[in-house]
Structure formats: C-alpha cells, structure tokens
From Swiss-Prot:
Lineage start: Bacteria, Pseudomonadati, Pseudomonadota, Gammaproteobacteria, Enterobacterales
Cytoplasmic side: 1-12, 64-81, 126-157, 258-288, 344-364, 408-417, 467-492
Protein name: Lipopolysaccharide biosynthesis protein WzxC
NCBIfam families with a match to the protein in the record: PRK10459.1
GO cellular component, as recorded: plasma membrane
Pfam family of the protein (one): Polysacc_synt
CDD domains documented for this protein: MATE_tuaB_like
Amino acid sequence: MSLREKTISGAKWSAIATVIIIGLGLVQMTVLARIIDNHQFGLLTVSLVIIALADTLSDFGIANSIIQRKEISHLELTTLYWLNVGLGIVVCVAVFLLSDLIGDVLNNPDLAPLIKTLSLAFVVIPHGQQFRALMQKELEFNKIGMIETSAVLAGFTCTVVSAHFWPLAMTAILGYLVNSAVRTLLFGYFGRKIYRPGLHFSLASVAPNLRFGAWLTADSIINYLNTNLSTLVLARILGAGVAGGYNLAYNVAVVPPMKLNPIITRVLFPAFAKIQDDTEKLRVNFYKLLSVVGIINFPALLGLMVVSNNFVPLVFGEKWNSIIPVLQLLCVVGLLRSVGNPIGSLLMAKARVDISFKFNVFKTFLFIPAIVIGGQMAGAIGVTLGFLLVQIINTILSYFVMIKPVLGSSYRQYILSLWLPFYLSLPTLVVSYALGIVLKGQLALGMLLAVQIATGVLAFVVMIVLSRHPLVVEVKRQFCRSEKMKMLLRAG
C-alpha cells in the first residue's frame, strides 16, 4: 500500500473513532451537567484541566519523537519505554503531594481528593504510550481507533451508570481511571506483537529524542497555559461553579475541533515526516490540509454560534443559560484555533518545534494579562473576550512567525486556504440565523433547533456539491465509488 493510500485509510479509521469518542464525550458531559450540581461539575472540569498538565509532563514528547525519527533501534525504544514509566511515577507522586496546595491556591479545597485520585492514572498510562506511537508511526489507525473507542466506551459506561446512583464529580474521575486502564491494557496487548521492551537502559542513545521531546514538552506547557489558564483564573476569582460553566461552553465550542483535527493531523504528521526534505510538496499539502480542516470545522462552529441561544437550554438545561454569550464567543475562538492546529504537524515533521515554543512564549505574555484583567473586570465574559483577542493576534502572526520560515513566502496561499472554508460556510450561517429569527415563538424549542440545524447542514451540502474548486473536487472523489456518483457530486 502506497503512502497516500495508507494516509487516506488512516484518516478514515481515525475519523470513525474520533467521531464516536467525541459523541460519547458530549453525551457524558450533557448527562453530568444535568444531574450533578454546578459546583460539583465545576470541580470536575477544574481537576481535569489540572491533570492535563501532568499528562503532558509524563509523556515528555517521547511518543512524537519516536514517530518523527525515520529509524529507531531496539535499545532506544527500550530506554524510552522505561524513561516513560519512570516519569509517570514521578508525576504521580508530585501531583498527589501537591493536590492540597493546588486546592488552596484555587480557593477550592474540595479539589484535593479528586486530584489525588486522578494522579493514580500516571502509574498506568506510560505502559501504553510507546505502543500507540509505534502503531501511529506505521499508520495502523484501525487498531488505534478500535482500542481508543473501546476504552472510552468503558469509561463512559462506568461514569454514566455510577453518576445516576452517586451524582458527584468523583464518578467521572473513576470513569477516567477505567478508561486509562482499558486503553493501556489493550495497547500493551497488541503493541507487544510489534516489539517487546527489554531490560536495557542507555540515556546517551536517546539524546536526540530527549532534545526533540524537551522542545515539544516546553511548547505543550506554554500551549497548556494559553488554553487552560482561563478556567483556573475563573475558579480562583469566581469559584468552581462559574469555571464549570465556562468549561462547559469551552468543551462544546473549542474541544471538539481540537479532537477532530487530529483525524487529519495525527495521520499526516508521519506522512509529512516522510517528505520533510521536499519543501514544495510540503507546502502544497500543508495548505490543502489547512483548507480541509477549515471545511470540517467552520460550518459546525458558525452554525453553533447562531443556534446557541436555543441549544444551551434544550441540551444542558436552563440553569446554564448564563453561558450562552460565552459559548458564542468561544465558537469564534474554536474556529481560529482549528486552523492553527495543523501548523504543529508541519513543525514537528521538520523538527522545528522550537519555533512554536518561542512563539507560544510570546503569546503567553499577551494571554496572561488579557485573561486576568478580563476576569477581574467582567468575569466569564471578560475572560472569553481576552481569549478571543489573543487568538485573533495569534492567527495573524502565525504565518509570519511559524509558516513562512519553514515553507517560504506563500501568504496568498495562506489567505486562500482560509477563505475557501469560510466562503463555503456562509450560507449555513445566514440560513440558520434567519430561521431562528423568523420562526422564534412559532415552534417548540426542540423543533426550532432541529429546523435550524437541518437547513444549515443542507445549505452546506449544496455548497459542497456545487463547488468546482480543485481541492473540493479532490475530496469529493474520495467518496465516489462510481461514475454516477461522480456526476451527482460534480466530482468528475
């Protein structure tokens, strides 16, 4: 199978698995938002935000360093495996011991037992990380998809069932541990058919991996602050309940694109790595990737923005109506972040994550005051506006700081790659918004939302079918199995 065929096959398997995982995550979040109180929901979201940093530290970029290397020896793999395990134990102990201090700093001492319980995951998770990286390196996304879907389903079942009997944040924490255990066991079982770690350790042999991982980890930490500081600031200033509401909106508008984009970017990182020496080919494929990511995300986020006033009370309940303006602003944030995501794959493929790190450090100096001042002045809305302002600046500067040094001057291609998905999504935005105004009060809330979504989707489908843009035609051809279908979708 050629690299192109493997890449397309991998994207399809990743798409199926990721859509299922996102769907289960949204259902779980909706159930929890409805049956546990705002404070408990806030404690859950804040504890998961904190544990995300520990997760980044425990991996230390080792998994991606394995993928980036064209060739890697058994000694190097074994050393990296035991290094991962050791880091996991260190992170587990550190998080456990610091949990009370973290709760006090955030003015939420109830966080401590949740964080202590979550820390146990870091003894388990490292045993599966390397096997996942090896499967990804070989583009075996069918196995990865089945394993991750099974693990999420196990965690989802545990959380939802136990939450009905015990409506507390701890139920979701236990579900997370079940998810981690199942995921690690399955990756370990299938991964050992590829390779088995030995009892060897040579730190000198993995120096290149550690240098790559150090840059990647530093970049991830800065990116973590730029992503999650808003939740932590709100938790400290206004309490876990407000932070939970903000995070609920964030998980609807920003997190799905962050999880959907790896359908493409995780598959194309190893593919980019294989053509890292051909700048022209990289440039063409990168801008195609940018447009495809936009086509996936723009219509959904612009549509959500205009239906959010009906979506929130129907799905989460009226007790969360205060998050509607926050959700609308975060839809724009999510849209801008979605088109920034592929840049990471490009820089990793060229082993230039140092550029991303330096830029993210600069962005952090903008982000921290924007979030803190916004939170002090206008609460959740102020934090969201600060986030949006920094994201707009980030989108403008990304080309000059990160793309141009790697791909050369190509500003026109950058703008056109963003314009295409926006242009295709405009009818969805207009139709859904207009129907929301015209039919307000004439239909039940659920029916009105269904009509808005259905017509918005139809408008986007019509635009895709009618489009003769070369990239859109190329994408449509991937779904055509017959000449009749090609004619129907105008993909000939």
